Amino acid sequence: MKKFGFISLLFTAVTLLLLGSPRANAEGEYAWPANYPGVMLQGFSWDAYEDTQWSKLAEDAGELSDYFDLIWVPNSGKCSTNPSMGYNPVYWFTNHNSSFGTETELREMIKTFNSFGTGIIEDVVVNHRNGVSTWTDFPTETYKGVTYEWGPWAICRNDEVANQPDEEKPTGAYDTGDNFDGCRDLDHTNTKVQDGIKAYLDFLTNDLGYVGFRYDMVKGFGAQYIKIYNESAKARFSVGEYWDGYDNITKWIENTGRTSAAFDFEFKWQLNAAFSAMDFSKLVWKRNGTLNQPAGLIHMDTYQRYAVTFIDNHDTYRESTKFTGDVATANAYMLCCPGTPCVFMKHWLENKDVIKKLIAIRKSVGITNQSTVEVLNTTTNQYVAKVTGTNGELIVKIGRGSYSPAGYTDADKVASSSSYTIWTKVPIKTLDTVRPTVTLSKESGLYLGGVDVVLTATNAPEGAKISYTTDGTTPSATNGTLVASGYSLHIDKKTTVKAVVVSGSEVVSTIKSATYKTEYLPVTIYLKKPEWTIVNFYAWSNDYEAADLLGIWPGKNMSGSTVEEQGITWYKWTTPKECDVVNIIFNNGKDQTVDINDVEGTRYFVLNELTGKSCTVTDVTDIYGGVSNISATGNVSVRCNGSVMVVTAPQQVASIALYSTSGAQVAQAQFANEISVSGLQRGIYLYRVTLADGTVAQGKVVR
């Protein structure tokens, strides 16, 4: 087993691989490394808001980093809806609080993985962008002293907003790719747009700490712009989502100047076809019409380096396109092929032990994205190949029937099932690393009257301590309370505990966190009155059936449950005292919202635009909800002075946020007493000012 001291060596090696040394830009320099031995994980699936919380990924960083060199996560910027998977982005620089966690949690997660030698790939969505409160009012943001203030000139002139009577008309060039009708298509021919995207990618890598990009919907704009962006960002890892066949994908790679890899959709489609028909000859294509090779981009040695293979992803995992065969066998095939394999999160969670073993085999043999393959047998019943890595070779058989490779015995079998077998003479190494961990004696939950939680460190270096916080901040050697292993912490009110193991000045474990409640805290839900003539609330929870809360579908008509707050009409409902977590749907008997899950405390919502028969909601609790320690209006004054909103306060201002009356954030600044409002229309806005001591003031201001 690897020992803890190996971490520093691993991290150093990976850092050198990622950063390299200064040199001329060779072919593929900013694309994907040659002979790359790494394995990637897609760290999310559709609507996987729980599994992909930044805090959850950070807690699992030790285990995940043992097996994966790269993890692809959703776009982390704040989007136009909540919840959102990240594909309707609004903010690039100033707001990375998303459906997956806060910006602080994001930075903690990236830093934790980087310390274990695993890089995080950002889902970069720059084909399109949404406005803050309208279709076209992009936020004004500042990065490295440059202010980016975009208008209709940044939008392709043939975007659908051109046909909207109440919206500004786009004046950019015609789109250089396919249209996306969910947001505004950006004009990539415009150098100001290009400069904004270059700055955004610089922020992702040099500020947040991402190591590369997964470009969403690259069919939406010309491939030549990927070259511009990657050469500016000096991206060592770039992969594009070009959903198409072999010829068009390879054409796209060439048009980027080979500055990006691409997902191997042909690999996925051939895998689907082979397993659905139980015809394993479909796993083979002929290179140059003569040499049998694994099907997909990877069948050509020219493109193996630029191929990221996958079995399913968040988009394909649906009835019409998802892989329906044996997942373990498909992963055995993928992990014994060239290209960089990308394991799907759902497959990982459901087949973890098997996939761990298969990754260990790949890494022990030294298979890379450019390893050579000799197909030994290809029939309807089976696929057999010899794969040569940097440390030796293996034989893999996929399918039915027996096969006895020459020179191998049963003792050389390192993995097998009824539908696959792998032989190798290379010793298979253990990838599990023994790392320090911190455990909490009680799981998150409700403990009426209070609870004692024991903090314990295991596998810790001599003299190590535990650092913990209860104020939501990140524990470290310099932040938090330092205690010895075995310390008992008494909790007598709702508290989130975060803890790490500290050795000297270094954090040497992942963060362990838990939230404890000591009394019943019923949920109160406010919905801003929508245009619907009927509004129903339908709710359920783990402990309550829908019939016990608001009745069976469509729930309770809330016409008699309205309140006026801050000049706004709200529908309001409070759960029974013992129900402190609830799921809810707003509907009018015909149209409805998406499921809003795990609602706690007091929450305020507004409806977004209806799409089909469902719509999303935006959580506006930060704007309208009650805030503890609100300052008197006499202590904090806010006024608009022309194009600037000015705050007068008795101490340093930590942050300023400005919102439209619909709840959309339109401007933000940190550690400043003023904020630019030059790009905002005249009208009433809501402000939220946080002072250095945590005091919060909120109210209305006129622009």
Label the predicted regions.
Residues 507-516, 592-603, 619, 696-703:
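Edge beta-strands of extracellular beta-sandwich domains
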Residues 626-703:
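C-terminal outer-membrane/trafficking sorting elements
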Residues 501, 588, 689-691:
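Conserved structural position at the C-terminal beta-strand
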